[in-house]
Amino acid sequence: MGNCTNDSYLIDGGKSNPYYDGTIMEFLQSRSPKDDPKNDYFSDLIEIIRLANMEEVLEEENVTFFAPTNWSIRKSVAMLNKMWYQMGNDSIKNLKQIKPSVWREYLSMYILKDKYTLKDIPQIDTTAIAAYPGQTFITYGGLPMNVGVVYGDANGVKYVGPRQILYSYIYDI
């Protein structure tokens, strides 16, 4: 019987600080290095924030921002281009082609006034929605959104696994 004695692949990073000492804009910029496209998650979002003239909101106001990544934004623009093509319209090739007011409206859907951490958001379980419905929050733009933490299962034990936030628009309030 043998075992692996080489554990050089193990790297103990120690405890990480869950708090970021900076503004939301600074955080987004730190995750969008110009010289490293592979690790660029938010450059499109940063451009949209600037086009919508919302930098001040994310730098100075006390808000929670559910930041869409480049992938999400590009996927949305691709879907919009498909719909526009079917209607006989030209494709969007540059984010500047969309009016700043439209960007502001859509960005506002992802911003909540006040700061919330995971412990401030109630549980949601889509298989037991009556027991764990999440909570309605009103966005920066005035829209009702249901927000809840989904507690994953681990090793067959309910609610002890990884957590993720479910964020969805409420149509009929």
Language model feature labels by segment:
Residues 2-173:
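Mature, structured domains of secreted/extracytosolic soluble proteins
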